[in-house]
A protein has these predicted regions:
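Hydrophobic residues in alpha-helical segments
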Residues: 31-32, 64
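Helix-loop-helix hairpins and the membrane-proximal interhelical loops
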Residues: 1-24, 32-35
């Protein structure tokens, strides 16, 4: 059997492809949404599809193909995937919403204390906006999950080889 490319591990190869496709899709959609190429989306979190979900669901699928669904590795990866996807759609999404509220409040401070006072005391904080696009909607997680499963199945022969 030929080893994989990444650390001689075929599962890592396929999981990387699932992550890459999910992230590259975000770059492509930025062209249509913004009318320009935004390569930073390749390393950014949040948005459609969830690369976290595509990565862990591809991992689960790859392990199922390579070692079977009765293996300990499958049990570990499916629990891990559930935690990651729950976190992506729940906790990280909530943190992103909270960041949006905080950013909005910070923008309104000058209305209450005056612009001169704000610039005097808060100029550094003004520059450091909190990142709002952290998590995913349940639909983005679902699409990422489906993408990961499809990628794993498409590389079935490679994983078995």
């Amino acid at each position: 059997m030929n080893p994989g490319i990444i650390l001689n591990n075929r599962v890592l190869d396929v999981v990387f492809i699932a992550w890459f496709i999910a992230q590259f899709y975000k770059v492509l959609t930025s062209i249509f949404k913004k009318g320009k190429l935004d390569i930073t989306r390749m390393w950014d979190t949040g948005g459609m599809p969830s690369s976290h979900s595509s990565t862990v669901s591809c991992l689960v699928t790859s392990i199922a193909i390579r070692y079977g669904i009765s293996s300990d590795l499958f049990a570990i990866t499916i629990i891990f995937a559930g935690i990651v996807m729950y976190d992506a759609a729940g906790i990280r999404r909530a943190a992103g919403k909270q960041a949006g509220v905080i950013n909005s409040l910070i923008e309104k401070i000058p209305l209450f204390i005056g612009k001169a006072q704000y610039n005097k005391h808060f100029s550094k904080e003004k520059e450091a906006k909190l990142k709002e696009l952290l998590g995913h909607t349940p639909f983005e997680v679902l699409v990422g999950c489906i993408l990961g499963i499809i990628i794993g199945l498409l590389f079935r022969k490679y994983l078995q080889g």
